[in-house]
Amino acid sequence: MAEKEFGPGYLVMPEDDGKVAHLSGLQIPSIGLTATDGSTVDLSEGGLTVVYAYPRTSPAIGGAPEGWDAIPGARGCTSQSCTFRDHFAEMKGVGVERLFGLSTQSTDYQKEAAERLHLPFPLLADSSLALCRALELPLFEVEGMTLIKRLTLIIDNGRIEHVSIQCFHRSEMPRM
């Protein structure tokens, strides 16, 4: 994977390695994911949906795994969630019906993050990797955890219409 530094000069941003190219046009399989609001969400249903996948959020107390900053695209999950939070009304205004964050972390872990970050939308847990495996999402491992590489899916009526891997700064949002 080609890499380049960004941010304060010590973070590594991934470049498109083609590992998400197969997703455009794909129909989402019917898989129930537990949401932080207690519901079960099936991404194959519903209208215009945006799902941003992220590796993990760090706990309020504690830090990232050792070497986290050297992993391309790993740093910035909290900022990414806050960016979607800050643009939530704007996204609804252009027709987005559903917005979700997605990680392989447990629902309990995600609940703490959703509350702490004041997210107006639920986070989805794929701790069993059912959706990740079905869609062949790019994954990586660190300290015994299997994590999703950062990406954003724009889904319309269960079909992936657009995939983006570039969303690293609070001012950047995937184009609708």
What are these regions (language model features)?
Residues 1-176:
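Chalcogenol-based redox active-site neighborhoods
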